[in-house]
Amino acid sequence: MTGKSVRDVERYQAVLGSLLSEEENKYCADCQAKGPRWASWNIGVFICIRCAGIHRNLGVHISRVKSVNLDQWTQEQIQCMQEMGNGKANRLYEAFLPENFRRPQTDQAVEGFIRDKYEKKKYMDRSIDINTFRKEKDDKWKKSNEPVSERKLEPIVFEKVKMPQKKEETQQSRKSSPKSTEPVIDLLGLDAPVPSTLTNGRPCSLEKDLDLFASVGLNSDSRKVSGSMPTSGSAGSVPENLNLFPEPGGKGEEAGKKQLSKDSILSLYGSQTPQLPAQGAMFMAPAQMAYPAAAYTSFPGVPPSSSMMGGMMAPSVGVMAQHGAAGMVTPMAIPAGYVGNVQAAVIGVPNGMMAAQQAGYVAGMAAVPQPVYGVQPAQQLQWNITQMTQQMAGMNFYGANGVMGYGQSMGGGGAQGSNQSLSTQLWK
């Protein structure tokens, strides 16, 4: 290859490259595939490799295919490509193509479309002379053939829309008007409230209404009426001395009067006469009860009693046995106050069996003296607190001979108790 031919090949490649850089030649003329590298120079279109194979099958009398990079081009071939191009050729061969036509994608469909387009000339505008059409300049048809998205649109100048003056005036008035300063609400009540007059002329303040931590003493009178207990002197009313939560804002003299004392509590019980059930457990019967600290020897299953209520409760279960009947055990509950003395009590044992007054027949049974029934109800109620303190003061946890018991004194209610053992007390 001579130097002249080499320079011509380079020049032809430069021309083909410039043609491929145009927007209309960047896509295949038949299937719209991107980046065509083949061309049908007699028709003057750039096509993809798939469409190039179909064009070869049409025959050289219809289409002559060459590669852009691999084949050698002549000046005549380059001139045919410059005269046509994809846009101008489609305007000729696709003049009557339907508007909603969709490009085929499969090989068989593409082949049928190419044959209809170039072989049968189904969509061709036959009124156009091809030779004169080739010599026409591209400027006449490029503008009409270019898609709308590819055309260069002239810049549109928009006029400034003037806002109505009313809105501007209102905005300026809002900016110019000073912001109304609202008073700062003092929640802790540290600052003095600034009174503000209402329409009716009364001074008020937001701080005073919203003061959550105001002094409690201001509302002490209203709280006394609604929350505190009534202080009337009737029989069913509760005295002021029982008010355990005095008002913090009250006077010092009233707070001193409301201190608790024994006399006020006793006077409260003296003014009320409630109905009490006739049970022995409610009466503080004078008794000196001794429970053995160890388990009962006659009945190992009975544990030692560990409760100490000072005359309020008797042993919950008394186990009685008959002389001569070693295997017969009769458990029964003995409430305090109803069993006067165990020594002469006849228990409901079958076959008329009676508990004897001997030391071997009763195991772990404490003597329960008879309660005092001749006391008035008011006096019995007064025992509730005073005698309770006396019992706690006179309690003797450990008596003689290692026996745990209680010692209590009931003034006028019974005889003075003494710390004695269980055996001497029961069978004396």
Curated annotation (Swiss-Prot):
Residues 161-182, 222-258 are annotated as: Disordered. It comes from the Eukaryota. Residues 13-139 form the Arf-GAP domain. One of its GO terms (molecular function) is zinc ion binding. A zinc finger (C4-type) spans 28-51. Keywords: GTPase activation, Metal-binding, Zinc, Zinc-finger. SUPFAM superfamilies: ArfGap/RecO-like zinc finger. Signal peptide: none annotated. The keyword Transferase does not apply. CDD domains: ArfGap_SMAP2. Residues 161-172 have a biased composition (Basic and acidic residues). One of its GO terms (cellular component) is cytoplasm. May interact with clathrin heavy chains. GTPase activating protein. May play a role in clathrin-dependent retrograde transport from early endosomes to the trans-Golgi network. This is Stromal membrane-associated protein 2.
